[in-house]
Every structure is written in C-alpha cells, then in structure tokens.
C-alpha cells in the first residue's frame, strides 16, 4: 500500500474492534459472491413479526426494474427501536437532549421514550391518521421530532420530514406532492440564539391555493412565542397527550411497505420524494451504524445532523435506536455561542462517537484551535464525517484538534437515495488516507464507468455507479416511478448512477470528486441548480439565470449565479441584495446565492443549451484553459463574463 499520508489502524482499536482487515475481506467477499446467504444471516439482526424466507429480488434493468428485500417478512420499525430494548434496557438513556441554550437539558430513557411514542401514536390516530397516510413533520431539533417519526412508524403512517430551514413555498410543494392530511410542527425553534418561526412558516405554506389536503396541524409548545391559531385545524400537542393511552400495539408492516418519504433536490426543479421501505432499510441502517462506528453497548453517540436530512433519519433515529444506543440530540449549532461549544458538549455528555460534517469542521478551523485549549475529549473514540468529501486539511485538523490523534476517522460516502453508508473505512479494518472514503461496505459493488458506460478497471477516474442492489436502497420517487427509472437507471444501462464522480487509487480506495450532474453541495446539503434558477427567474426583473457551484472555503461549494436582467433594468447592488433575499424566501436560507454576476448574455449552443462547464470554470476562477468554445452561438460572451467575474484571486 502506498504510504502517502497513510493513517494505520491503531493496535488498541484493532484489538477490540468488531471487524479487523482479514474479517472485512472475508465478509465483503461473501456479501458479493453470495448476497442471499450473507443477508439471510444479517437480516436477523432486527426483530421480525413474521420471519422472512425470501431475501432478494432485484434487477437494475431499466425495462424490468425490481428492488425487493426480505420481502415476505413483516415487522415494525418503532418496535425495533423501542419495544425490543424494554426487557433488559428500559432504564438506559435513549436520548440526551441539550437545547440551544446549554442550561436546558433532558434525559429520556427507553422506557419513557416508548411511553411517549405510544401516547403520540394514539394521538395521531385520534386526529384521523391511518396506515399509509403521509404525515408532514416540520420540527426543531427536539426529542419530540423523533417521537413524531417513531409514532408514525408505529401505526404504519408514512412520515415526510421537512428541514426546519426550508421556506413556506418549499414546504407547500412537499405537502402538495404527498397530499398530507396532518402536519406536525412547533410554535418556534431555537437555533444560534434566534427563534425560528416554524408555525408561521407552516401557516404561510398552508395558505398556498394548491394545498387542499391538510385537516389538522399539531403544534408543540417549544418557546411559548406568539403564534396565529386556526380554530378547528390547529391543536396543541400537549392537549392531545392528556387523554392518550400509553399502550399502542405496533402495526404489522410488510418489509416493502413504505416507512418514510424524504424530499431531495434533483437536477430538475421539482423536489423528488425519495421513498424508503421498512425491512431492508432497518437492517441496513442498524448494521451500518454498528459496524461503521464500531458501536459498543452503552456508548454515547452524537450525530450533529438535522433530523430533516437523511443522516438524521438513519444515524440519529433509526440506526442508533435500533441498536439501543444513547443518542445526543442538540437543538442549536455546535459553534454557538462560541466555537468551544462542540468540545464542551463532548466533555459534558462524555460522547464516545461523533458524526459531523466537513462544513462545521472548516468553520471551526477558521476560528482557530485556541477554542479547544480547555477541551479534554478523552471519552471520544470514533469520529465520522458526512455530507460531502472532506478536504485533507480539514481531515487532519479534525484528527489532531478534536480527535487528539487517537480517534479513527470514518469518512462516509452515501446519499439520501441509498438509505445508509455505502463507501467508508471500518475503524478496526481500514488504514485511512485523508480525503478518501476508502472501501465499500458489505454488499456494495461500486464501479467507475466512462461517459459511454464502459467499466474502467484499476487506478482510474470516472462516473461512480453501483452494480447491484443493497437493502437500504430507495424503491421509487413517490408518485413518479418513471422519474426514478430515468434519473438513476437510464444513463448507464443495468447500473445505478449516483450522479457523483470518483477516482480509484492504486490501493483500490475511492475518492469522491463531486457531482457530475446539475446538483451542488452546499454545507453538505444538496441543491438542484434548476431549483435556484427557477426562483431567480420568477423575479419580474430577471430574464434568465444560470447557477453553478464554486469552491468555497467553509461551505465546500458556494452558489454562483449569472443573471441576465430584463431589458432596460438597471444593474445595482440593491437589486443584487433583493435577489438574494428573493431566493431565500422562495427556497430557504441554504439556497441564497453567494455571488451574483450580471450577465448581458450566457454561453449557449446554437440550439439554445446553456454550456454550464464554461460557467463553472469562470466561477472557479479557472479561466486560462476553458476548452473548445466553437459550438457556442456567440463565443464573445465568454470574454465578457471572464472580464466581469466576481471570484477573482489576483
């Protein structure tokens, strides 16, 4: 193995780890050669009401697509996260919660969480929620968000969690698509010392003329802030619980029955509802949580992701709770009120495993390591990274300043669509290289292909595809199966196309190089460029817009917009700020453009297609080697854009 920046598995980790390198190789080989036998065994890690006898019926043929796992078994996800721990671990703490203000803290045992979930499940039933109904959840980072999800799962309802930073328009589009009858929210959330008007955003969303399905809005009292109230529609969370029973029999669900919807950005403007089912997802989320983080019974595990993202679903709720872990949930941001907050919380709650995002690490790095002078960190054992590729400088800083050079880093690559981690080191098995996601998890078959779909062998770079299914894989785009087939299985026949590029080095390690489609990754969160462009063009003074990502020191990628104004409109700094606020209102703060360049014209082919590769290079300040511009209708446009670019370094 090449020695460039190689971090060897330490002896003390290897001695106690779940798997070492030899075991990894043996298990991985078995999972690829004999997936039926491998998953027949590992599917037993969760509790089944009716045990499965059929394991895998899958095909990536776009004319005969099929993804089925454990498909004749029945189970309940909520029972796997709660009931099965009660006989031995009822008093174990399931959730440690720390508010935005550190003086607010709660501990909830598995027994208490079980009672809370049963009561709220009965409350949902009292509001007309039935098996198969879609319930929209728009909540702050409080334990009740997990309670709401698990209560839906308990009665067979399908939850659709919307990130608390999304705008009313974004919420409305998700409610309309899922035809939700019930929405669960909070009066306000707290984040970084500010109150977030969640209920007001829901009220605005539900005023959208196309929202016709919602009958009830259940409101959690978090801050006691002033809110508007719609009689007959709105109902307080606490008033529903006053009469609810603590006994609720879990619904028996088929392995392929839906568990949740989670909307994600695509390369077209409309958000797509990623649908995950119950059996395979629960097996995969719990197994990856245990093996990737080398989880040991009783450990305190902190995932800093928001519950509105897939990481919050798989590695804050379903995976850890299925494994009986103690999960730390933090309402605010780990660098407020100061960058020392992350270290203080690790020490205060004796955190053993930390899973966070490169964007936070880079933000802390920019503030300086002096904020960690008082940080002990001796309880920390394993650290993870998620959301985007981590640059080697941030990896090393994380390793040295937070991990004190004794914690392995698992740099995990996966997607909303994959349900769980696909490429990752395993702490006791994998020597790591800063910036590399290293090797595939069990049952995962990555490959690199060229643009024609030919498989590239050995050390190479290309489009990252997957050759066979795994249990956590999404099953469809809700209400639009054709879009599912088109997006993931038509580009390269017989393969799942990830939308990412990657290279494989001489040791077989994978390095993710970023999106190859029109999706940008801002602070670990995906945004479709078409979504941001649509928002800009909906402003009356904007004639045309093209949006690309560009390298950003903190966020990984920033948003760079080229905007052509309507004829006669004056370019001004005021209008630039107005457009930034406009996008913020339309989509949410995450989508706010960092840079807006006025463009009298955009580089287009004669057929009118915008050539984004030129725009990406100009935004990244790579203007010396733009490549062939002969297909452009007006090559002079490029010169103008280069001269007026905003991201100059000289």
From Swiss-Prot:
Pfam families on file: ACAS_N, AMP-binding, AMP-binding_C
Catalytic activity, as annotated: acetate + ATP + CoA = acetyl-CoA + AMP + diphosphate
Top-level taxon of the source organism: Bacteria
Annotated positions binding Mg(2+): 537, 539, 542
Residues that bind ATP: 387-389, 411-416, 500, 515, 526
One GO cellular component, as annotated: cytosol
Record-linked InterPro entries: Ac_CoA_lig, ACAS_N, AMP-bd_C, AMP-bd_C_sf, AMP-binding_CS, AMP-dep_synth/lig_dom, ANL_N_sf
CDD domains: ACS (cd05966)
N6-acetyllysine sites (modified residues): 609
Assigned keywords, A-Z: Acetylation, ATP-binding, Ligase, Magnesium, Metal-binding, Nucleotide-binding
EC annotation from Swiss-Prot or TrEMBL: 6.2.1.1
Function: Catalyzes the conversion of acetate into acetyl-CoA (AcCoA), an essential intermediate at the junction of anabolic and catabolic pathways. AcsA undergoes a two-step reaction. In the first half reaction, AcsA combines acetate with ATP to form acetyl-adenylate (AcAMP) intermediate. In the second half reaction, it can then transfer the acetyl group from AcAMP to the sulfhydryl group of CoA, forming the product AcCoA.
PANTHER family cross-referenced by the UniProt entry: ACETYL-COENZYME A SYNTHETASE
Record NCBIfam families: Ac_CoA_lig_AcsA, PRK00174.1
Family: Belongs to the ATP-dependent AMP-binding enzyme family.
The protein's name in its UniProt record: Acetyl-coenzyme A synthetase
Organism of origin: Shewanella putrefaciens (strain CN-32 / ATCC BAA-453)
């Amino acid at each position: 193995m090449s020695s460039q920046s190689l971090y060897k598995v330490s002896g003390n980790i290897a001695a106690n780890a779940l798997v070492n390198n030899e075991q990894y190789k043996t298990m991985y080989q078995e999972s690829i050669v004999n997936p039926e036998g491998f998953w027949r065994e590992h599917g037993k890690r969760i509790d089944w009401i009716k045990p499965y006898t059929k394991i895998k019926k899958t095909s990536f043929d776009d004319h005969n697509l099929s993804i089925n796992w454990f498909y004749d078994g029945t189970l309940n996800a909520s029972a796997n996260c709660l009931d099965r721990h009660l006989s031995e671990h009822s008093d174990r703490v399931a959730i440690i919660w720390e508010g935005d203000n550190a003086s607010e803290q709660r501990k909830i045992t598995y027994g208490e969480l079980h009672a809370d979930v049963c009561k709220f499940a009965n409350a949902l039933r009292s509001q007309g929620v039935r098996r198969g109904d879609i319930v929209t959840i728009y909540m702050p980072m409080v334990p009740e968000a997990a309670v709401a999800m698990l209560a839906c799962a308990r009665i067979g309802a399908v939850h659709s969690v919307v990130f608390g930073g999304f705008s009313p328009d974004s919420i409305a589009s998700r409610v309309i698509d899922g035809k939700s009858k019930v929405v669960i929210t909070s009066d306000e959330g707290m984040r970084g010392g500010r109150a977030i008007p969640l209920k007001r955003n829901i009220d605005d969303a539900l005023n959208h003329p196309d929202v016709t399905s919602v009958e009830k809005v259940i409101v959690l009292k978090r801050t006691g802030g002033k809110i508007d109230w719609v009689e007959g529609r709105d109902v307080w969370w606490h008033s529903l619980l006053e009469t609810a029973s603590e006994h609720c029999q879990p619904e028996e669900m088929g392995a392929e029955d839906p568990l949740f919807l989670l909307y994600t950005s695509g390369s077209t403007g409309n958000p797509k509802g990623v649908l995950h089912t119950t059996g395979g997802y629960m097996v995969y989320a719990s197994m990856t949580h245990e093996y990737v983080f080398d989880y040991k019974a009783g450990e305190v595990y902190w995932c800093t992701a928001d519950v509105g993202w897939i990481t919050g679903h798989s590695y804050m709720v379903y995976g850890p709770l299925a494994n009986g872990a103690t999960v730390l949930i933090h309402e605010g941001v780990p660098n407020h009120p100061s960058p020392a907050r992350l270290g203080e919380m690790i020490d205060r709650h004796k955190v053993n495993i930390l899973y966070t995002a490169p964007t936070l690490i880079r933000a802390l790095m920019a503030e300086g390591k002096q904020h960690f002078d008082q940080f002990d960190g001796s309880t920390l054992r394993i650290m993870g990274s998620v959301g985007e590729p981590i640059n080697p400088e941030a990896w090393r800083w994380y390793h040295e300043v937070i991990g004190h050079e004794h914690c392995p880093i698992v740099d995990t690559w996966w997607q909303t669509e994959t349900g769980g981690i696909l490429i990752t080191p395993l702490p006791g098995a994998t020597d790591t290289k800063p910036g590399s996601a290293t090797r595939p998890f069990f049952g995962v078959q990555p490959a690199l292909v060229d643009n024609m779909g030919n498989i590239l062998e050995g050390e190479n770079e290309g489009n990252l595809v997957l050759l066979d299914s795994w249990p956590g894989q999404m099953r469809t785009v809700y209400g639009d199966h054709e879009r599912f087939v088109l997006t993931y299985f038509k580009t390269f026949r017989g393969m799942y196309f990830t939308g990412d590029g990657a290279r494989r080095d001489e040791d077989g390690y994978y390095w993710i190089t970023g999106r190859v489609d029109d999706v940008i990754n801002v602070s670990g969160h995906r945004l479709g460029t078409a979504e941001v462009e649509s928002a800009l063009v909906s402003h009356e003074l904007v004639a045309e817009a093209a949006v690309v990502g560009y390298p950003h020191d903190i966020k990984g990628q920033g948003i760079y917009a080229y905007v052509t104004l309507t004829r006669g409109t004056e370019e001004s700094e005021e209008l630039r700020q107005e457009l930034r606020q406009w996008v913020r209102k339309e989509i949410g703060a995450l989508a706010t453009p960092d840079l807006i360049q006025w463009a009298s014209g955009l580089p287009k082919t004669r057929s009118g297609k915008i050539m984004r590769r030129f725009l990406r290079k100009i935004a990244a300040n790579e203007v010396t080697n733009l490549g062939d511009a002969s297909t452009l209708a007006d090559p002079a446009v490029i010169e103008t854009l280069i001269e007026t670019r905003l991201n100059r370094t000289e």
